[in-house]
């Protein structure tokens, strides 16, 4: 039986802090960071970023693609590729996504690769159209940033959008006078 830590903050502690506690408590925290953490941080964050993107897709598919997601996961095990985010919306439309935690904006080559991979996979075969999600730590090159205005099936998600707040239903919106009400604005 094998267990994995599903909380990235705890996983970070167990990967970088715990094993180096003696050096850190001896005053070598900066050195631990420079020699160990800094060298492995991008790799560590790449996997964490994929999980963040999957969670975002589960929660916000309707806001992004117009329909709630029925299933969200990843495609692994192909000889020549994996797909970071994949799933199906309630209307049967499939979607595929690429998550990039890198220091450069996403370019057209990455978009083309995702299109090629989405066409190769057996998941969603026979579908009539699909949507593409591109998640980027550093945004998108100008030629990629204009793609959603030309092709409505392409969705670009940068860090600002990853932390977006959904629109509250009218019954969930706080009243202006909620603080003055006897029950503090609570609604059953």
How does the language model describe each region?
Residues 1-82:
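Accessory nucleic acid-recognition modules appended to NTPase machines
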